[in-house]
């Protein structure tokens, strides 16, 4: 009797956690504070569920080997960031305002990465207990949240000075990454649905996500959204994609529409490349200058721990020496290195680089060993693409949303007997 009550309680807790995470994702882009509190509650429940499973010997380490490995490397990644933030906070006696913001983001982000790793492991182990009703409620919350977010985004675009919407974040790029990760969670949860009306919801969410990313004006997230969507289609409908010309034609048509609707941003990018010799103070030129400053900093500091102010000072000296007219790069280098690996290496050294590489290597190893990680691949692909031209994880908001989406993408349960396909 006691065991039955425990199992029912565990099932209830896991289903509550999924709904709570979806609620947090749905609120995150227009409400501040509450989504983070929900995340903390779910993380504490997740820690308790894992301890319960270990104590009762109900954790199958062999079956969950990949997710245990992913949990371990995420813990290592978070601990290195946490140790760096505490260390730098102690030795930097007079940090600038930007440095304090940077350190604070890393410190809070590292704590949430640690807690998020437990949420991920809990849903990976107990995801089979999640009911179809729970998934439908969760997807409904995300759908409503995205629609409300679009309303706030349109209002901000029309009635404020922000041409690129920021919503609840400090930068448009941060908002776009968070929206991308929310879309990844939606895609994975849609895999377990059979009813045709949810396919209409899939189209609505695709359109809303695209509209939000368009309003954010971040090119790389549009590329990432297309890549993530293609990966999901290949995972889910690969036979139809190969054999059904109508689905293939529809896919090509959607891609063409997306490219045409964002053509102005691609034209700007091409103009930046063409005019780079005469005007390097552009979005592209700034990145080239910042990357050069980052590489120069790494070469001179041997890949050890460094303070944000030291990095900014030396990178600006490099930019002034090699790109004296690049005002954009000189200004923005104080925020981050606009590349995930360069960002980590310049601050946490080669130890930080290794911890980030371990996450990708773990996923790659799982792919080679044919582990069931199709859900995990979606946000990881989005993070990798976005991280090529920007720093995503230093900001505590994006790190939190990434971990929530990644955790939801770890849910594994039997696929429905009948799936909706196009004949």
What are these regions (language model features)?
Residues 115-161, 169-237, 261:
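Alpha-helical transmembrane segments of multi-pass inner-membrane proteins
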Residues 243-246, 347-381:
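Hydrophobic transmembrane alpha-helices and their immediate junctions
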Residues 66-82, 91-125, 140, 146, ...:
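Aromatic-anchored transmembrane helix interface
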Residues 281-285, 305-348:
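Long extracytoplasmic/lumenal interhelical loops at the membrane interface
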Residues 37-41, 219-231, 352-357:
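Transmembrane-embedded, aromatic-rich helix segments that form part
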Residues 359, 377-388, 392-423:
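Transmembrane alpha-helices of multi-pass inner-membrane enzymes
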Residues 215, 236-278, 292-299:
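A membrane-periplasm/extracellular boundary helix in multi-pass inner-membrane enzymes
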Residues 1-93, 124, 128-136, 191-200, ...:
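Transmembrane signal-anchor hairpin modules in multi-pass inner-membrane enzymes, especially those
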